[in-house]
Amino acid sequence: QTGFHKRKDEQQPLLHAPARKKLRSTSEYSCQTLFLNSENSDIKICALGEEWRLHKMYLCQSGYFSSMFSGSWKESSMNIIELEIPDQNIDVEALQVAFGSLYGDDVLIKPSRVVAILAAACMLQLDGLIKQCGKTMKETITVKTVCGYYTSVETYGLDSVKKKCLEWLLNNLMTHQNVKLFKELSINVMKQLIGSSNLFVMQVEMDVYTALKKWMFLQLVPSWNGSLKQLLTETDVWFSKQRKDFEGMTFLETEQGKPFVSVFRHLRLQYIISDLASARTIEQDAIVPSEWLSSVYKQQWFAVLQAEQDSEVGPQEIDKEELEGNSMRCGRKLAKAGEYCWRWTGFNFGFDLLVTYTNRCIIFKRNTLNQPCSGSVSLQPQRSVAFRIRLGSFDSRGKLLRSRTTGYRILILKKDQEQVVMHFDSRLLTFPLYICCNFLYISSEKRIENNRHPEN
Protein backbone atom coordinates (compact mmCIF):
# COMPACT_ATOMS: atom_id res chain seq x y z
CA GLN A 1 0.00 0.00 0.00
CA THR A 2 1.41 3.34 -1.00
CA GLY A 3 1.57 6.36 1.23
CA PHE A 4 -0.38 8.69 -1.04
CA HIS A 5 -3.13 8.69 -3.62
CA LYS A 6 -1.71 8.88 -7.14
CA ARG A 7 -1.90 12.20 -8.92
CA LYS A 8 -1.04 13.18 -12.48
CA ASP A 9 2.37 14.77 -12.87
CA GLU A 10 2.13 18.53 -12.84
CA GLN A 11 4.14 20.46 -15.38
CA GLN A 12 6.19 22.71 -13.14
CA PRO A 13 9.52 24.38 -14.01
CA LEU A 14 11.32 22.92 -10.98
CA LEU A 15 10.30 19.39 -11.90
CA HIS A 16 11.86 19.68 -15.35
CA ALA A 17 15.13 21.29 -14.31
CA PRO A 18 17.73 18.55 -14.81
CA ALA A 19 20.11 17.74 -12.01
CA ARG A 20 23.46 16.76 -13.53
CA LYS A 21 25.01 13.90 -11.62
CA LYS A 22 28.47 12.43 -12.09
CA LEU A 23 28.07 8.67 -11.89
CA ARG A 24 31.33 6.99 -12.94
CA SER A 25 34.44 7.74 -14.95
CA THR A 26 33.89 6.39 -18.48
CA SER A 27 34.92 7.96 -21.76
CA GLU A 28 32.82 10.07 -24.07
CA TYR A 29 33.87 7.63 -26.73
CA SER A 30 32.07 4.77 -24.97
CA CYS A 31 28.85 6.73 -24.75
CA GLN A 32 28.84 8.13 -28.29
CA THR A 33 30.32 5.22 -30.24
CA LEU A 34 29.25 2.14 -28.31
CA PHE A 35 25.92 3.18 -26.78
CA LEU A 36 24.44 5.75 -29.15
CA ASN A 37 25.91 4.30 -32.37
CA SER A 38 25.78 0.64 -31.19
CA GLU A 39 29.16 -0.23 -32.75
CA ASN A 40 30.40 -3.80 -32.14
CA SER A 41 27.19 -4.71 -30.30
CA ASP A 42 27.03 -8.33 -29.14
CA ILE A 43 23.53 -8.38 -27.62
CA LYS A 44 20.11 -6.91 -28.39
CA ILE A 45 17.71 -6.00 -25.59
CA CYS A 46 14.03 -5.70 -26.50
CA ALA A 47 11.51 -4.07 -24.16
CA LEU A 48 8.34 -1.97 -24.37
CA GLY A 49 8.36 -2.13 -28.16
CA GLU A 50 11.89 -0.74 -28.46
CA GLU A 51 15.29 -2.36 -28.88
CA TRP A 52 18.79 -1.49 -27.77
CA ARG A 53 21.98 -2.92 -29.33
CA LEU A 54 24.34 -3.12 -26.38
CA HIS A 55 27.43 -4.90 -25.05
CA LYS A 56 27.51 -7.67 -22.45
CA MET A 57 30.70 -6.26 -20.97
CA TYR A 58 28.88 -3.04 -20.05
CA LEU A 59 25.63 -4.74 -19.07
CA CYS A 60 27.48 -6.82 -16.47
CA GLN A 61 27.75 -3.67 -14.34
CA SER A 62 24.05 -4.27 -13.70
CA GLY A 63 23.32 -6.81 -10.97
CA TYR A 64 20.31 -7.96 -12.98
CA PHE A 65 22.30 -8.76 -16.14
CA SER A 66 25.34 -9.98 -14.24
CA SER A 67 23.19 -12.70 -12.65
CA MET A 68 21.56 -13.45 -15.98
CA PHE A 69 24.81 -13.93 -17.87
CA SER A 70 26.73 -15.80 -15.19
CA GLY A 71 23.96 -18.05 -13.94
CA SER A 72 21.88 -20.86 -15.34
CA TRP A 73 19.29 -18.61 -16.96
CA LYS A 74 18.40 -19.62 -20.49
CA GLU A 75 19.21 -16.05 -21.56
CA SER A 76 22.87 -16.45 -20.54
CA SER A 77 23.83 -17.65 -24.03
CA MET A 78 21.27 -15.71 -26.06
CA ASN A 79 22.07 -12.72 -28.27
CA ILE A 80 18.53 -11.36 -28.25
CA ILE A 81 16.79 -10.90 -24.92
CA GLU A 82 13.15 -9.96 -24.44
CA LEU A 83 12.79 -8.07 -21.17
CA GLU A 84 9.49 -8.24 -19.36
CA ILE A 85 8.72 -4.96 -17.61
CA PRO A 86 6.11 -5.62 -14.89
CA ASP A 87 6.53 -2.19 -13.27
CA GLN A 88 4.23 0.42 -14.81
CA ASN A 89 6.49 3.22 -13.61
CA ILE A 90 9.17 2.11 -16.10
CA ASP A 91 8.97 3.54 -19.61
CA VAL A 92 11.22 3.64 -22.67
CA GLU A 93 12.86 6.91 -21.68
CA ALA A 94 13.74 5.55 -18.23
CA LEU A 95 15.33 2.45 -19.75
CA GLN A 96 17.29 4.66 -22.16
CA VAL A 97 18.70 6.63 -19.20
CA ALA A 98 19.42 3.44 -17.24
CA PHE A 99 21.27 1.76 -20.11
CA GLY A 100 23.08 4.99 -20.94
CA SER A 101 24.36 5.26 -17.38
CA LEU A 102 26.37 2.08 -17.98
CA TYR A 103 28.28 3.78 -20.81
CA GLY A 104 28.53 7.45 -19.95
CA ASP A 105 29.77 9.38 -16.93
CA ASP A 106 27.10 12.11 -17.18
CA VAL A 107 23.45 11.37 -16.49
CA LEU A 108 20.79 14.06 -16.52
CA ILE A 109 18.06 13.31 -13.96
CA LYS A 110 15.06 15.59 -14.18
CA PRO A 111 12.95 15.63 -11.00
CA SER A 112 9.84 15.00 -13.11
CA ARG A 113 11.51 11.82 -14.44
CA VAL A 114 13.24 10.62 -11.30
CA VAL A 115 10.55 8.13 -10.21
CA ALA A 116 10.57 6.35 -13.59
CA ILE A 117 14.38 6.28 -13.64
CA LEU A 118 14.48 4.98 -10.06
CA ALA A 119 12.06 2.20 -11.02
CA ALA A 120 14.28 1.18 -13.94
CA ALA A 121 17.43 1.41 -11.82
CA CYS A 122 15.91 -0.81 -9.13
CA MET A 123 14.78 -3.43 -11.63
CA LEU A 124 18.22 -3.53 -13.27
CA GLN A 125 20.00 -3.31 -9.89
CA LEU A 126 22.05 -0.24 -10.79
CA ASP A 127 23.25 0.85 -7.36
CA GLY A 128 24.98 4.02 -8.52
CA LEU A 129 21.93 5.27 -10.40
CA ILE A 130 19.65 4.37 -7.47
CA LYS A 131 21.86 6.44 -5.17
CA GLN A 132 21.78 9.43 -7.53
CA CYS A 133 18.00 9.21 -7.89
CA GLY A 134 17.76 9.34 -4.11
CA LYS A 135 20.05 12.37 -3.98
CA THR A 136 17.99 14.18 -6.64
CA MET A 137 14.80 13.45 -4.70
CA LYS A 138 16.21 14.79 -1.43
CA GLU A 139 17.26 18.01 -3.16
CA THR A 140 13.91 18.60 -4.89
CA ILE A 141 11.25 17.83 -2.26
CA THR A 142 8.41 20.36 -2.62
CA VAL A 143 4.65 20.42 -2.11
CA LYS A 144 4.31 19.12 -5.68
CA THR A 145 6.83 16.29 -5.44
CA VAL A 146 6.69 15.05 -1.84
CA CYS A 147 3.70 12.74 -2.31
CA GLY A 148 4.97 11.04 -5.45
CA TYR A 149 8.43 10.68 -3.94
CA TYR A 150 7.09 9.15 -0.73
CA THR A 151 5.00 6.63 -2.67
CA SER A 152 7.91 5.56 -4.85
CA VAL A 153 10.47 5.23 -2.06
CA GLU A 154 8.05 3.08 -0.06
CA THR A 155 7.90 0.82 -3.11
CA TYR A 156 11.62 0.83 -3.88
CA GLY A 157 13.01 0.99 -0.36
CA LEU A 158 14.92 4.27 -0.13
CA ASP A 159 14.52 4.81 3.60
CA SER A 160 16.68 7.94 3.71
CA VAL A 161 14.44 9.66 1.14
CA LYS A 162 11.32 8.49 2.98
CA LYS A 163 12.70 10.04 6.17
CA LYS A 164 13.37 13.33 4.33
CA CYS A 165 9.83 13.38 2.93
CA LEU A 166 8.36 12.84 6.40
CA GLU A 167 10.56 15.60 7.83
CA TRP A 168 9.38 17.97 5.10
CA LEU A 169 5.75 17.08 5.82
CA LEU A 170 6.17 17.51 9.60
CA ASN A 171 7.65 20.97 8.97
CA ASN A 172 5.14 22.11 6.34
CA LEU A 173 1.78 20.45 6.99
CA MET A 174 0.68 23.13 9.46
CA THR A 175 3.03 26.01 8.61
CA HIS A 176 2.21 26.08 4.87
CA GLN A 177 -1.22 24.47 4.51
CA ASN A 178 -2.13 23.49 0.96
CA VAL A 179 -5.38 22.17 -0.54
CA LYS A 180 -3.70 19.83 -3.04
CA LEU A 181 -1.43 18.42 -0.36
CA PHE A 182 -4.44 17.69 1.89
CA LYS A 183 -6.01 15.80 -1.03
CA GLU A 184 -2.93 13.66 -1.60
CA LEU A 185 -2.02 12.73 1.97
CA SER A 186 -3.16 9.21 2.77
CA ILE A 187 -4.56 7.97 6.06
CA ASN A 188 -1.36 6.04 6.74
CA VAL A 189 0.91 9.06 6.33
CA MET A 190 -1.41 11.47 8.14
CA LYS A 191 -1.44 9.08 11.10
CA GLN A 192 2.36 9.31 11.34
CA LEU A 193 2.31 13.10 11.11
CA ILE A 194 -0.45 13.73 13.66
CA GLY A 195 1.08 11.28 16.12
CA SER A 196 4.48 12.96 16.09
CA SER A 197 5.76 15.45 18.66
CA ASN A 198 7.90 16.85 15.84
CA LEU A 199 4.84 18.16 13.99
CA PHE A 200 5.51 21.89 13.54
CA VAL A 201 2.23 23.10 15.01
CA MET A 202 1.06 26.65 14.43
CA GLN A 203 -1.05 28.08 17.29
CA VAL A 204 -2.44 25.18 19.39
CA GLU A 205 -3.76 21.60 19.27
CA MET A 206 -7.20 22.86 18.23
CA ASP A 207 -5.59 23.97 14.98
CA VAL A 208 -4.36 20.42 14.41
CA TYR A 209 -7.97 19.22 14.82
CA THR A 210 -9.16 21.90 12.38
CA ALA A 211 -6.53 20.86 9.82
CA LEU A 212 -7.60 17.22 10.21
CA LYS A 213 -11.22 18.19 9.68
CA LYS A 214 -10.33 19.97 6.43
CA TRP A 215 -8.16 17.04 5.30
CA MET A 216 -10.96 14.54 5.99
CA PHE A 217 -13.43 16.66 4.01
CA LEU A 218 -11.07 16.69 1.00
CA GLN A 219 -10.55 12.93 1.25
CA LEU A 220 -14.32 12.47 1.11
CA VAL A 221 -15.00 15.20 -1.48
CA PRO A 222 -11.82 15.21 -3.65
CA SER A 223 -13.62 17.05 -6.46
CA TRP A 224 -13.77 20.24 -4.34
CA ASN A 225 -11.60 22.91 -5.98
CA GLY A 226 -11.89 26.06 -3.87
CA SER A 227 -9.17 28.07 -2.17
CA LEU A 228 -7.58 27.50 1.22
CA LYS A 229 -9.47 30.54 2.58
CA GLN A 230 -12.80 28.95 1.61
CA LEU A 231 -11.90 25.47 2.83
CA LEU A 232 -12.86 25.66 6.53
CA THR A 233 -16.25 27.24 5.82
CA GLU A 234 -17.04 24.64 3.16
CA THR A 235 -15.85 21.87 5.48
CA ASP A 236 -18.12 23.01 8.31
CA VAL A 237 -21.12 23.35 5.96
CA TRP A 238 -20.56 19.84 4.59
CA PHE A 239 -20.27 18.20 8.03
CA SER A 240 -23.29 20.17 9.25
CA LYS A 241 -25.35 18.60 6.45
CA GLN A 242 -23.99 15.15 7.29
CA ARG A 243 -25.02 15.50 10.95
CA LYS A 244 -28.68 15.34 9.93
CA ASP A 245 -28.12 11.73 8.87
CA PHE A 246 -25.96 10.70 11.85
CA GLU A 247 -28.96 9.53 13.92
CA GLY A 248 -27.24 10.37 17.19
CA MET A 249 -23.83 9.04 16.15
CA THR A 250 -20.69 11.09 15.80
CA PHE A 251 -19.12 11.16 12.35
CA LEU A 252 -16.20 8.86 13.22
CA GLU A 253 -18.74 6.21 14.27
CA THR A 254 -20.40 6.21 10.82
CA GLU A 255 -19.30 4.02 7.91
CA GLN A 256 -17.93 7.10 6.15
CA GLY A 257 -15.97 8.16 9.20
CA LYS A 258 -14.56 4.84 10.46
CA PRO A 259 -11.53 4.80 8.11
CA PHE A 260 -10.31 8.03 9.73
CA VAL A 261 -10.52 6.86 13.36
CA SER A 262 -6.85 5.83 13.50
CA VAL A 263 -5.75 9.36 12.56
CA PHE A 264 -8.04 11.22 14.97
CA ARG A 265 -6.88 8.88 17.77
CA HIS A 266 -3.54 10.71 17.64
CA LEU A 267 -5.07 14.07 18.51
CA ARG A 268 -4.04 15.27 21.97
CA LEU A 269 -7.58 16.02 23.06
CA GLN A 270 -6.55 17.07 26.57
CA TYR A 271 -5.15 20.28 25.07
CA ILE A 272 -8.33 20.96 23.09
CA ILE A 273 -10.84 20.64 25.92
CA SER A 274 -8.68 22.87 28.14
CA ASP A 275 -10.01 25.88 26.20
CA LEU A 276 -13.72 26.70 26.49
CA ALA A 277 -14.28 27.86 22.90
CA SER A 278 -12.43 24.83 21.53
CA ALA A 279 -14.32 22.43 23.80
CA ARG A 280 -17.63 23.87 22.60
CA THR A 281 -16.60 23.59 18.95
CA ILE A 282 -15.46 19.98 19.19
CA GLU A 283 -18.71 19.04 20.96
CA GLN A 284 -20.84 20.85 18.37
CA ASP A 285 -18.97 19.34 15.42
CA ALA A 286 -19.97 15.84 16.59
CA ILE A 287 -17.03 14.31 14.75
CA VAL A 288 -15.10 12.84 17.71
CA PRO A 289 -16.94 10.10 19.68
CA SER A 290 -18.32 11.33 23.00
CA GLU A 291 -16.66 8.38 24.80
CA TRP A 292 -13.26 9.70 23.78
CA LEU A 293 -14.06 13.12 25.20
CA SER A 294 -15.55 11.72 28.42
CA SER A 295 -12.35 9.81 29.08
CA VAL A 296 -10.25 12.93 28.56
CA TYR A 297 -12.52 15.09 30.74
CA LYS A 298 -12.05 12.54 33.54
CA GLN A 299 -8.28 12.49 33.07
CA GLN A 300 -8.10 16.28 33.14
CA TRP A 301 -10.30 16.56 36.21
CA PHE A 302 -7.91 14.31 38.13
CA ALA A 303 -5.05 16.49 36.88
CA VAL A 304 -6.80 19.63 38.14
CA LEU A 305 -7.29 18.08 41.59
CA GLN A 306 -3.68 16.98 41.56
CA ALA A 307 -2.48 20.51 40.82
CA GLU A 308 -4.81 22.09 43.40
CA GLN A 309 -4.69 19.66 46.32
CA ASP A 310 -1.63 17.46 45.99
CA SER A 311 1.19 20.02 46.09
CA GLU A 312 1.91 19.37 42.43
CA VAL A 313 4.86 21.46 41.30
CA GLY A 314 5.34 19.92 37.86
CA PRO A 315 7.78 17.50 36.19
CA GLN A 316 11.04 16.95 38.03
CA GLU A 317 12.89 14.98 35.37
CA ILE A 318 12.80 14.41 31.62
CA ASP A 319 10.46 11.61 30.61
CA LYS A 320 11.09 11.52 26.87
CA GLU A 321 8.41 8.92 26.15
CA GLU A 322 5.81 11.01 27.96
CA LEU A 323 6.96 14.19 26.23
CA GLU A 324 6.93 12.56 22.80
CA GLY A 325 3.47 11.10 23.29
CA ASN A 326 1.57 13.57 25.47
CA SER A 327 3.17 17.00 25.47
CA MET A 328 1.25 20.11 24.54
CA ARG A 329 2.14 21.20 20.98
CA CYS A 330 1.93 24.88 20.04
CA GLY A 331 3.61 27.39 17.79
CA ARG A 332 3.80 30.91 16.44
CA LYS A 333 4.94 32.65 13.27
CA LEU A 334 6.99 35.83 13.71
CA ALA A 335 6.50 37.65 10.41
CA LYS A 336 9.31 40.18 10.82
CA ALA A 337 11.93 41.41 13.26
CA GLY A 338 10.56 43.15 16.35
CA GLU A 339 9.40 42.49 19.91
CA TYR A 340 6.64 40.00 20.62
CA CYS A 341 4.88 38.84 23.79
CA TRP A 342 2.14 36.23 23.90
CA ARG A 343 0.57 33.29 25.71
CA TRP A 344 -1.04 30.22 24.17
CA THR A 345 -4.72 29.68 25.02
CA GLY A 346 -5.91 26.97 27.36
CA PHE A 347 -5.89 26.10 31.05
CA ASN A 348 -2.42 25.01 32.18
CA PHE A 349 -3.11 24.08 35.80
CA GLY A 350 -2.36 27.51 37.22
CA PHE A 351 0.89 27.96 35.32
CA ASP A 352 0.39 31.17 33.31
CA LEU A 353 3.36 31.13 30.94
CA LEU A 354 4.17 34.34 29.07
CA VAL A 355 6.53 34.06 26.10
CA THR A 356 8.59 37.03 24.93
CA TYR A 357 10.79 37.36 21.87
CA THR A 358 13.19 40.31 22.03
CA ASN A 359 16.83 41.05 21.15
CA ARG A 360 17.41 37.59 19.65
CA CYS A 361 16.20 35.97 22.89
CA ILE A 362 13.19 33.91 23.88
CA ILE A 363 12.12 34.51 27.49
CA PHE A 364 9.66 32.47 29.58
CA LYS A 365 7.92 34.20 32.49
CA ARG A 366 5.73 32.57 35.11
CA ASN A 367 3.04 35.18 35.63
CA THR A 368 1.19 35.16 38.94
CA LEU A 369 0.30 38.67 40.10
CA ASN A 370 2.00 41.13 37.76
CA GLN A 371 -0.27 40.88 34.72
CA PRO A 372 -3.96 40.07 34.20
CA CYS A 373 -4.83 36.45 33.49
CA SER A 374 -8.18 35.07 32.35
CA GLY A 375 -7.87 31.98 34.56
CA SER A 376 -6.73 31.09 38.05
CA VAL A 377 -3.02 31.04 38.79
CA SER A 378 -1.01 28.94 41.20
CA LEU A 379 0.60 30.79 44.10
CA GLN A 380 3.01 27.98 44.95
CA PRO A 381 6.54 29.25 45.60
CA GLN A 382 7.93 27.22 42.70
CA ARG A 383 6.53 25.51 39.61
CA SER A 384 8.38 23.49 37.01
CA VAL A 385 7.64 22.78 33.36
CA ALA A 386 9.21 20.37 30.88
CA PHE A 387 9.64 21.99 27.49
CA ARG A 388 11.34 22.00 24.12
CA ILE A 389 11.64 24.94 21.71
CA ARG A 390 12.33 24.58 18.01
CA LEU A 391 13.00 27.45 15.63
CA GLY A 392 12.88 27.24 11.87
CA SER A 393 12.91 29.37 8.75
CA PHE A 394 11.95 28.06 5.33
CA ASP A 395 12.53 28.94 1.69
CA SER A 396 9.69 29.32 -0.81
CA ARG A 397 9.66 25.56 -1.47
CA GLY A 398 9.28 24.63 2.19
CA LYS A 399 12.90 23.57 2.64
CA LEU A 400 14.20 24.17 6.15
CA LEU A 401 16.96 26.76 5.78
CA ARG A 402 17.94 27.19 9.43
CA SER A 403 16.84 25.50 12.60
CA ARG A 404 17.70 25.37 16.25
CA THR A 405 16.34 23.52 19.27
CA THR A 406 16.80 23.56 23.02
CA GLY A 407 16.14 19.85 23.26
CA TYR A 408 13.91 18.73 26.14
CA ARG A 409 14.61 20.62 29.36
CA ILE A 410 13.14 21.23 32.83
CA LEU A 411 12.63 24.83 33.93
CA ILE A 412 11.84 25.81 37.54
CA LEU A 413 10.37 29.28 38.07
CA LYS A 414 9.41 31.20 41.19
CA LYS A 415 6.40 33.52 41.23
CA ASP A 416 6.71 36.18 38.50
CA GLN A 417 10.22 35.00 37.65
CA GLU A 418 11.43 35.16 34.06
CA GLN A 419 14.23 33.25 32.40
CA VAL A 420 15.99 33.45 29.03
CA VAL A 421 15.51 29.98 27.54
CA MET A 422 17.08 30.53 24.13
CA HIS A 423 19.58 33.00 22.73
CA PHE A 424 20.77 32.81 19.16
CA ASP A 425 23.16 34.36 16.68
CA SER A 426 21.63 37.02 14.43
CA ARG A 427 23.03 35.13 11.44
CA LEU A 428 20.53 32.37 12.20
CA LEU A 429 17.63 34.80 11.95
CA THR A 430 15.68 34.75 8.71
CA PHE A 431 12.14 36.05 8.86
CA PRO A 432 9.46 34.91 8.87
CA LEU A 433 10.63 32.86 11.84
CA TYR A 434 8.60 29.89 13.04
CA ILE A 435 8.63 28.89 16.72
CA CYS A 436 7.26 25.54 17.87
CA CYS A 437 7.11 24.42 21.51
CA ASN A 438 6.29 21.28 23.46
CA PHE A 439 5.19 21.61 27.09
CA LEU A 440 4.35 19.28 29.96
CA TYR A 441 2.96 20.97 33.09
CA ILE A 442 1.99 17.94 35.21
CA SER A 443 4.17 15.00 36.29
CA SER A 444 3.36 11.88 34.35
CA GLU A 445 3.74 9.45 37.30
CA LYS A 446 1.01 11.10 39.38
CA ARG A 447 -1.33 11.36 36.42
CA ILE A 448 -1.00 7.64 35.81
CA GLU A 449 -1.66 6.86 39.48
CA ASN A 450 -4.76 9.06 39.54
CA ASN A 451 -6.18 7.43 36.43
CA ARG A 452 -5.63 3.89 37.62
CA HIS A 453 -8.80 2.06 38.64
CA PRO A 454 -8.65 0.39 42.09
CA GLU A 455 -8.26 -3.35 41.90
CA ASN A 456 -11.04 -5.56 43.24
Residue ranges, per PLM feature:
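Short intrinsically disordered, low-complexity coil segments enriched in acidic
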Residues: 1-7, 64-68, 208, 391-393
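Cytosolic, low-complexity regulatory segments enriched in Ser/Pro/Gly with interspersed Lys/Arg
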Residues: 1-27
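Extreme N-terminal leader/anchor segments
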Residues: 13, 19, 32, 43-44
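Intrinsic-disorder-associated interaction segments
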Residues: 20, 24, 58, 253-256
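Eukaryotic intrinsically disordered and solvent-exposed regulatory patches
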Residues: 28-32, 39-41, 103-104, 373, ...
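Canonical BTB/POZ domain core
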Residues: 37-145, 187-217
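Alpha-helical protein-protein interaction/assembly modules
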Residues: 130-302
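Terminal end segments
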Residues: 274, 281-456
